[in-house]
UniProtKB/Swiss-Prot annotation:
Its cofactor is Mg(2+). It holds the Pfam family MMR_HSR1. Necessary for normal cell division and for the maintenance of normal septation. GO terms for cellular component: cytosol. This is Probable GTP-binding protein EngB. Mg(2+) binds at residues 40, 62. The keyword GTP-binding applies. InterPro entries: G_ENGB_dom, GTP-bd, GTP-bd_ribosome_bio_YsxC, P-loop_NTPase. HAMAP family: GTPase_EngB. Belongs to the TRAFAC class TrmE-Era-EngA-EngB-Septin-like GTPase superfamily. EngB GTPase family. PANTHER family: ENGB-TYPE G DOMAIN-CONTAINING PROTEIN, MSS1/TRME-RELATED GTP-BINDING PROTEIN.
């Protein structure tokens, strides 16, 4: 199995919708989550690049579909954050349309990483995203981000609760904790991405 070097990931393009994306070939893994769930921080931690994906304390800064190339034909996709964002309704609807089109029509999408703040997991939109992926037979890795915000006992309890709740999705849904600050969960994320890029069977969940 090839272990991809995520530190060599480079920015390719930003697109307002799928019509402006590169050809629908190769393998793409998309990162999705509510605004301020820590998507950009996770991408920067994964690639060990401080500013590959722009981070912001203002929710909703990721307004475009941002593509990054890990290796030829292997791409990471930073999708527009969903949920809360201080933007006009018209703009929000445009993001949602772009997000929906990408998820429904992009044939090279082979894995979905859904990021949720460990303190506020499984909001309605998060569950919709996972239900959609399961219905489309796309495997999901849920990262419970900002896990450093909780003490060890509370963190383990949240992980157990979300894993039990995720059984209801009846799909290939793996749940792990993640902290960009402490670099916790990065190896599990890399292993999962490696398996998707190599077209392998799902792995067993890691222990906390």
């Amino acid at each position: 199995m090839t272990n991809w070097n995520y530190q060599q990931t480079n920015f390719v393009t930003s697109a307002p919708d799928i019509r402006h994306l590169p050809p629908d070939t190769g393998i793409e893994v998309a990162f999705a989550g509510r605004s301020n769930a820590g998507k950009s921080s996770a991408l920067n931690t994964l690639t060990n690049q401080r500013s590959l994906a722009r981070t912001s304390k203002t929710p909703g800064r990721t307004q475009l579909i941002n593509l990054f190339e890990v290796a030829e034909g292997k791409r990471l996709v930073d999708l527009p954050g969903y949920g809360y964002a201080e933007v006009p309704e018209e703009v929000k609807l445009k993001w949602q349309k772009a997000l929906g089109e990408y998820l429904e029509k992009r044939q090279c999408l082979k894995g979905l990483v859904v990021l949720m703040d460990i303190r506020h997991p499984l909001k309605d939109l998060d569950q919709q995203m996972i239900h959609w992926a399961v219905a489309s037979e796309i495997p999901v890795l849920v990262l419970l981000t900002k896990s450093d915000k909780l003490a060890s006992g509370a963190r383990k309890a949240q992980l157990k609760m979300v894993r039990e709740a995720a059984l209801a999705f009846n799909g290939d849904v793996q749940i792990e904790t993640f902290s960009s600050l402490k670099k916790q969960g990065v190896d599990v994320l890399r292993q999962k991405l490696d398996s998707w890029y190599n077209g392998l069977e799902p792995a067993v969940e890691a222990e906390e």
